Design a protein with these regions (language model features):
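Contiguous segments within soluble domain cores/interaction surfaces
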Residues: 20-136, 147-148, 153-159, 163-171
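A short tyrosine-centered beta-strand micro-motif
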Residues: 141-147
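Bacterial N-terminal signal peptides
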Residues: 2-14
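Sec/Tat signal peptide C-region and signal peptidase I cleavage site
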Residues: 15-19
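Residue-level signal for functionally critical sites in structured catalytic/ligand-binding pockets
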Residues: 2-3, 61-62, 140
Length: 174
């Protein structure tokens, strides 16, 4: 009888552990465009691109065409859809730069993409972005943002960065 009770207890505990394992089904985008943020720059990564923590994130404009101006932050908010609610998940943001890539002053070769770790929770809204901070980042063309979990691509967002003329009234303040 003791063996049967032990087996039942083992089965119940393993099914409870399975039920709590996070399962990411997909990404649902909630908004995109240009944002205003307070940034705490934490230094440059090995590619020469600034790493920063963003706080006080505010959506400023829903745009796919982004002005190539220093200080412009663009990206998206998203929700991780899956189980179990509020479970933490580690994702990866890949930013693919337009050809020929970015050439930081610390590099002689163009950088074609960069990666960032995203900490998110299932069912909660998260934020991913890129801020144009240096002149070498003002590369016009298609910028592709991807969100990955392990080797599985969950989502893609595309923005077009363009040099704007001085007559770009809608771009003032960005």
């Amino acid at each position: 009888m003791g063996i049967i009770v032990s087996i039942i207890a083992l089965l119940l505990s393993s099914s409870a552990a399975y039920a709590q394992t996070p399962l990411v089904e997909r990404i649902r985008f909630t908004e995109y465009g240009i944002y205003t943020v307070d940034r705490d720059v934490q230094g440059r990564d090995v590619l020469g691109i600034n790493r920063a923590a963003a706080t006080n994130v505010r959506h400023a404009a829903t745009l796919r065409t982004i002005p190539a101006q220093i200080g412009t932050t663009f990206g998206f908010r998203y929700e991780v859809v899956g189980r179990a609610h509020a479970a933490p998940v580690e994702l990866r943001q890949v930013v693919i730069f337009p050809s020929p890539g970015l050439t930081p002053s610390s590099s002689s070769k163009p950088v074609r993409q960069d990666e960032f770790v995203l900490q998110a929770r299932i069912g909660e809204t998260s934020y991913a972005s890129y801020t144009l901070e240096d002149a070498f980042e003002l590369v016009p063309g298609e910028w592709v943002f991807e969100i990955w979990q392990g080797n599985r691509k969950l989502a893609t967002q595309t923005f077009r960065v363009e040099r704007m003329s001085n007559a770009c009234d809608p771009c003032e303040g960005f």
